[in-house]
């Protein structure tokens, strides 16, 4: 399987998982706690997949526009010295929020389009609140930490829909640019 097909399958799988859980119930209040937790985790898996896809596709599209540190971060690589003094690569530990912002920025840069994920909107605020829910579920300290409220489900679903839309918008802007360039090159060759 080539890298493009892997990316397509990855996005399809994580989005399908979210949709399966989210669409199973008519009302959010009907979603049992265990499935609320699964939904939050699945949505964050989707966010991580989107970040990976944006960074991978950016490197495939136009790697020459990036600085070495951008390439390393896009590959999620860090470097260290072994006990014998040899340089070696290790997996970078990237914080969620800056990594997501970076993924959108590097994808826009690769496609040379003017796009920036807005951090001044209520959807971004919902995403930030959702990060706290994800963190609480991932590192529970008391039984109440495992409860996901209806408001928290609303936030995480709003963040999901927004990131999904932003991903689509970025893709459409990139495609539009490609089609415009193709049309212009056909005009100049005629």
Language model segments and positions:
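Flexible secondary-structure boundary motifs
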Residues: 62-136, 140, 144, 162-176
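Charged alpha-helical initiation segments
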Residues: 1-41, 58, 185-189
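Short secondary-structure subsegments characteristic of cysteine-rich extracellular domains
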Residues: 151-167
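Hydrophobic alpha-helical packing segments in soluble, helical-rich domains
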Residues: 43-50
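Charge-rich, solvent-exposed alpha-helical interaction surfaces
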Residues: 10-13, 17, 103, 159-162
């Amino acid at each position: 399987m080539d890298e493009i097909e892997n990316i397509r399958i990855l996005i399809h799988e994580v989005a399908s998982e979210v949709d399966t859980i989210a669409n199973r119930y008519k009302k959010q209040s009907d979603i049992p706690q265990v499935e609320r937790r699964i939904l939050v985790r699945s949505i964050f898996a989707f966010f991580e997949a989107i970040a990976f896809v944006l960074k991978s596709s950016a490197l495939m599209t136009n790697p020459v526009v990036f600085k070495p540190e951008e390439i390393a971060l896009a590959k999620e690589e860090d470097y260290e010295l072994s006990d014998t003094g040899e340089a070696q690569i290790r997996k970078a530990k990237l914080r969620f929020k800056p990594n997501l912002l970076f993924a959108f920025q590097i994808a826009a840069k690769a496609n040379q389009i003017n796009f920036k994920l807005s951090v001044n909107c209520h959807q971004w605020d919902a995403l930030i609140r959702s990060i706290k829910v994800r963190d609480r579920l991932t590192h529970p300290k008391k039984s109440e930490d495992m409860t996901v409220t209806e408001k928290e489900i609303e936030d995480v679903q709003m963040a999901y829909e927004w990131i999904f839309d932003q991903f689509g918008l970025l893709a459409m802007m990139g495609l539009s640019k490609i089609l415009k360039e193709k049309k212009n090159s056909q005009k100049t060759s005629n």
